[in-house]
C-alpha cells in the first residue's frame, strides 16, 4: 500500500490539478485512487512547468499536464486503428506521450476516431466541445441545421453496447 501511495504522490506532483474544470472530473481514475488512498487537498502541490495544449486537431485536445503516462492511448491507437498516431519517449516518470508527428495531432496519422479519448483515465485527451455552437445554430431561425453521423461515430457507438471495436452500427442508430 505504501508503494502505491508513493507512486500516486509522484504522479500527483507532475499532474495539472485543474480537476474542477476537467471533463473527467466525476469519472477520473486518478481522483478515485487519490480518494481511496487518503490523499487530501492539502497534499496538492502548486502547478509548475505547464505544457501548452495541443489544439492542432479540429476534433481532439491533448493536455500533457493531465497525462499520467499509462500508455492506454498508445495501445488503443495501435490496436483499434493500426495507425500509431501517438507514441512515447523516455521511461517511468520521464516518459513523454506525444503525437507521432512533432507538429501535433493534426499532422500525425490520427484518424480522429476518439478511441484514445475513451480510454484516457484523466482527461489528458478530450474531444473539442462544440455544444454551445450547436445550440446557437439550432436556435437560429435563419439556419437549416443538418445532422450527419461520421463514420468514426458509427463504429465507436457500438462499443457502448459491447460490440467489438470497429463494428459499424449504421442502421441500428
Predicted regions and their residues:
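Iron-sulfur-associated redox domains of electron-transfer enzymes in respiratory
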Residues: 1-2, 127-173
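Fe-S ferredoxin-like electron-transfer domains
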Residues: 1-112, 118, 125-137, 144
Amino acid at each position: 500500500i505504501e508503494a502505491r501511495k508513493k507512486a500516486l504522490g509522484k504522479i500527483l506532483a507532475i499532474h495539472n490539478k485543474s480537476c474542477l474544470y476537467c471533463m473527467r472530473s466525476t469519472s477520473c481514475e486518478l481522483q478515485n485512487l487519490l480518494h481511496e488512498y487518503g490523499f487530501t487537498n492539502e497534499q496538492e502541490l502548486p502547478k509548475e512547468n505547464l505544457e501548452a495544449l495541443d489544439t492542432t486537431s479540429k476534433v481532439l485536445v491533448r493536455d500533457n499536464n493531465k497525462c499520467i503516462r499509462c500508455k492506454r492511448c498508445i495501445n488503443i491507437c495501435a490496436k483499434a486503428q493500426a495507425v500509431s498516431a501517438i507514441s512515447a519517449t523516455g521511461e517511468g516518470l520521464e516518459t513523454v506521450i506525444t503525437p507521432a508527428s512533432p507538429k501535433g495531432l493534426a499532422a500525425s496519422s490520427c484518424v480522429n476516431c476518439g478511441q484514445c479519448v475513451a480510454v484516457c483515465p484523466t482527461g489528458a485527451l478530450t474531444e473539442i466541445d462544440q455544444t454551445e455552437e450547436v445550440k446557437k445554430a439550432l436556435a437560429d431561425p435563419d439556419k437549416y441545421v443538418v445532422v450527419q453521423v461520421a463514420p468514426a461515430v458509427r463504429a465507436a457507438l457500438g462499443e457502448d453496447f459491447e460490440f467489438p471495436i470497429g463494428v459499424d452500427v449504421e442502421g441500428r442508430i
